[in-house]
Amino acid sequence: MEVKLEEHFNKTFVTENNTAASQNTASPAWEDYRGTENNTSAARNTAFPVWEDYRGSVDDLQYFLIGLYTFVSLLGFMGNLLILMAVMKKRNQKTTVNFLIGNLAFSDILVVLFCSPFTLTSVLLDQWMFGKAMCHIMPFLQCVSVLVSTLILISIAIVRYHMIKHPISNNLTANHGYFLIATVWTLGFAICSPLPVFHSLVELKETFGSALLSSKYLCVESWPSDSYRIAFTISLLLVQYILPLVCLTVSHTSVCRSISCGLSHKENRLEENEMINLTLHPSKKSRDQAKPPSTQKWSYSFIRKHRRRYSKKTACVLPAPAGPSQEKHLTVPENPGSVRSQLSPSSKVIPGVPICFEVKPEESSDAQEMRVKRSLTRIKKRSRSVFYRLTILILVFAVSWMPLHVFHVVTDFNDNLISNRHFKLVYCICHLLGMMSCCLNPILYGFLNNGIKADLRALIHCLHMS
């Protein structure tokens, strides 16, 4: 991600070189050879102040940049490492979303390791000091890590959309997660494959002809033409920013809409239940007037009070004293000398039948209505929380990565729009904003995830105790 710095200076030097050479083309014919040397010297003398202006643009802020990059890198590394450890701790309870979140943490760790130190070193030292092989490998790894992290965000959004839209037929397993991760990494390697080919080292001594720049190299992109470079930049803009932003917005909007529709259905069902209760259950006075006579009721004898809730209890069901018309149906015939004839008159009833049932206290319609309303209030609160969380996810991605992509597009189409003195400072600001997404992803996808939050707390507690 730091190659834009050297590429900008390389193209700036070529522009200054052509300008200086064109200003000295009017030399006489007999001084052609000498004029050629003067043109080269003039070009170098003109471009060297450009290099000095470019090189000293962040000298006053180098300690501040070192501290800021160190803080962002440590925060992103530790946060993603905790998420990765928590997900690996629950590897026996694999879900597709948790599996993707673990891979997101791993890719963000790669972004922190590959992008921060190499970018900061190139900004402060104004040279590439990691060798020719790393010049071909490191830009490729930087691009792959950022692209994979972005594609995993798309995968998480798609999986959540599928789980909300098809909750009953949700059959996503760990194998689907493996397939998604394999697809993401394959796309990342394929899209970033041109970078190892079109990179090369440029020696500053040969460029400026100054002994002060001996043994200093720049790692720059060496595309066959500007059209190739612009096409690659636009393709990265589409894949790394526009496509993920559209997918996140559409998916999360659909999720919020589904939740709000489900909530409205529950409210409508509550209103229907209230109308049914008013129809089937009249007022208290009318219920008292419609009570049956006491001679037609059964008396229930329980072991404990009726107000408490019992799981399984045995009770004896005894008929109430019957009238004269019903006594012949309730009395058991007596035979002389039988056990029945020896019982007392009060015991000459049908024997109690042991039954098992669940006793629940009778709940009034007002209490039931309050309970349902409290449930709806909790659901509304959770719905607002989900809406705010998904909105923050979209805003964090859009705000953190937009400046860097705009910077790349602007510098590819117009190098002179940003001055040499402010070029590195503007680039560092855009790059740090992009790195902030690696620090916020653990919070948004891990610490605010109910499935991982408890494991994170236990893990942090164990680390604190040790």
UniProtKB/Swiss-Prot annotation:
The chain crosses the membrane at residues 64-84, 99-119, 139-159, 178-198, 230-250, 390-410, 428-448. A lipid is attached at C462 (S-palmitoyl cysteine). Residues 1-63, 120-138, 199-229, 411-427 are extracellular. Glycans are attached at N10, N17, N38, N39. It is found in: Cell membrane. Disulfide bonds join C135-C219. It is a multi-pass membrane protein. GO terms for biological process: cardiac left ventricle morphogenesis; chemical synaptic transmission; eating behavior; generation of ovulation cycle rhythm; negative regulation of acute inflammatory response to antigenic stimulus; negative regulation of apoptotic process; negative regulation of glutamate secretion; negative regulation of synaptic transmission, GABAergic. Residues 85-98, 160-177, 251-389, 449-466 are cytoplasmic. GO terms for cellular component: GABA-ergic synapse; membrane; neuron projection; plasma membrane; presynapse. GO terms for molecular function: neuropeptide Y receptor activity; pancreatic polypeptide receptor activity; peptide YY receptor activity. Residues 323-346 are annotated as: Disordered. Keywords: Cell membrane, Disulfide bond, G-protein coupled receptor, Glycoprotein, Lipoprotein, Membrane, Palmitate, Receptor, Transducer, Transmembrane, Transmembrane helix. Receptor for neuropeptide Y and peptide YY. The activity of this receptor is mediated by G proteins that inhibit adenylate cyclase activity. Seems to be associated with food intake. Could be involved in feeding disorders. Belongs to the G-protein coupled receptor 1 family. This is Neuropeptide Y receptor type 5. It comes from Mus musculus. The gene is Npy5r.
